[in-house]
Design a protein with these regions (language model features):
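Periplasmic c-type cytochrome electron-transfer domains
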Residues: 16-285
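Sec-dependent N-terminal signal peptides
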Residues: 4-13
Length: 285
């Protein structure tokens, strides 16, 4: 009995150490310039900035559903959420871009996205007197492509979702998660989910060779964040699964060979629901 108590104590201690070392809570909104972010929000939803004037950033990253990346699909890939993306240090599908502003530039000019050019964006902005006045008020050099990217960057910085129940738990509030949710977190670690989904965004900052069993490819892809996962369906890079429970089951059966049972899957599901943070204030403005 004494040995069992000691063993349980060691396991509890190791769990606490892992929790503290590989997960980082978001306890407050990342600082951003409100004027620039408000301007960036306008640019984000403006279809006139795309080559054929039919799509905007918001076409794929719908603000009405919290920029979760679940809007109309115009590419073969499942658009990722923009919530908390500013906290990442690698970007793009394969993680080759190391800077948020550079990712925005790519999204604006890529023929698979807005498919526009720097000069076209500047000309479209200059056609709108309200835009021109706002740029001159915020930036000394007025309307430039770099300033447009800067405004969009500030808007995306504003899309943090702090203080999820998991964040509160990490910060020391042991009552923030129920007993089942804590067991789900333990199972999440036990089965190696945290080996990819870790850090401040529980993913988003490492790349992995995806297994054939899941997505039929050996591509090196960026691991997605699990924050707000209950809001960001569909799942996987091509959006093949529409329900979170089904995504968990697919991983259980194909990666872990069914090692954990349905009860543990349900506990992990309950834990993942605790990753939903506060809606960014700028989405109400």
């Amino acid at each position: 009995m004494i040995k069992l108590i000691l063993l349980l104590g060691i396991i509890t201690s190791l769990f606490a150490q892992i929790k503290d070392e590989i997960f980082i809570p978001i306890t407050q909104q990342q600082p951003y310039n409100r004027q620039k972010a408000a301007l960036g929000k306008e640019l984000f939803i403006d279809k006139r900035l795309s080559k054929d004037k039919t799509i905007s950033c918001e076409t794929c990253h719908n603000l009405e559903i919290k920029a979760t990346g679940t809007s109309d699909k115009i590419t073969k890939d499942n658009p990722p959420t923009l919530l908390n993306v500013s906290l990442n240090f690698i970007f793009s599908k394969k993680g080759e871009i190391k800077n948020l502003s550079e990712q925005i530039k790519k999204s604006l000019t890529s023929d698979k996205e807005l498919n526009t050019q720097e000069s076209f964006i500047i000309s479209q902005i200059n056609k709108n007197p309200k835009y021109e006045a706002k740029f001159k008020n915020i930036y000394k050099d007025g309307v430039t492509f770099e300033n447009s990217v800067d405004a969009l960057t500030e808007f995306i910085k504003a899309l943090n979702t702090p203080l999820s129940r998991f964040d509160k738990f990490l910060a020391g509030d042991k009552t923030a998660l129920s007993e089942d949710e804590q067991k789900g977190f333990e199972a999440f670690i036990k089965y190696g989910c945290a080996s990819c989904h870790n850090g401040i965004n529980l993913g988003g900052n490492i790349i992995s060779v995806m297994k054939n069993e899941i997505i039929n490819t050996n591509e090196i892809l960026k691991v997605p964040t699990l924050r707000n996962i209950s809001l960001t369906k569909p799942y996987f890079h091509d959006g093949r699964v529409n329900e979170l429970r089904d995504a968990i089951e697919m991983i259980r059966s194909r990666i872990h060979s069914g090692k954990h049972d349905e009860k543990e899957c349900e506990l992990i599901y309950k834990f993942l629901l605790t990753l939903e943070g506060n809606t960014p204030e700028i989405l109400y403005e």
